[in-house]
């Protein structure tokens, strides 16, 4: 319950920061997001602003994978932990696997949706990198649907709003672990088509 409440506070906090920063954004397809449903949200990643516009646009409480180093920052790190964010050690494959296991517990025991940037790092504009498997393994193991999210920036960001596009959620009930590459290709193609 606390993490759900913290998630809603993060939603309001993100909206306020964007408003006071004079950053405009719009979202298409919000009607495809059910308020009482949990998702594994798979998104492209282009800017540090991505997290803010996602939290501000999607009303559901969200946790996300983030670098373990950020948890060491005083106050900020504590706040992220309280909100249910998930630490990732990218230099250690076993630790990365434990992050997926932690996310699985979180999505099963809370009302949080999980946000995942499968590229693993920021990519400029319309060039998608290869997708890592962690978020898709989580979706298949948990049987929660994947919600593809595309964030669109113009190369000249001055006075241009950021656009978010939500596509239809993808049911993962019929996907086995051996099908994860098929699922990855499906989601990646959806996001790439919005970027083109």
Where are these regions (language model features)?
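Catalytic core of membrane glycerolipid acyltransferases/transacylases, capturing the structured
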Residues: 1-12, 19-21, 35-93
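Glycine-rich helix-loop-beta junction characteristic of Rossmann-like nucleotide cofactor-binding loops
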Residues: 29-34
